[in-house]
């Protein structure tokens, strides 16, 4: 059975798309092939994203930020952007997708201080989890 590829894209691939990839891997089982990338790959995962995912029982510490470039020639069934395009000018455009979905999740990097950043990461995590739940229900 060929699993549909689901590519999650954002600006840096350090937080939101990493969480989405992990949630789909967990909730979708072997029904999907989750991937994630960013216009620019961050140097490392956002430590607050790693901590927030551990709070819900998922360990993303072994995942690495990836640039979109290696995926540009791939065909994917679903492209999911997690950017607020109006704000994030670096949100990538991807030509090889059959279906395109937009989940406008606020970028925690816009936080003014560490406490606000942690709160935004948790809110993003919870919003992404709800989106993934609906995605799995609608596309399984």
Cite the ranges covered by each PLM segment.
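Short polar/charged helix/loop
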Residues: 1-140
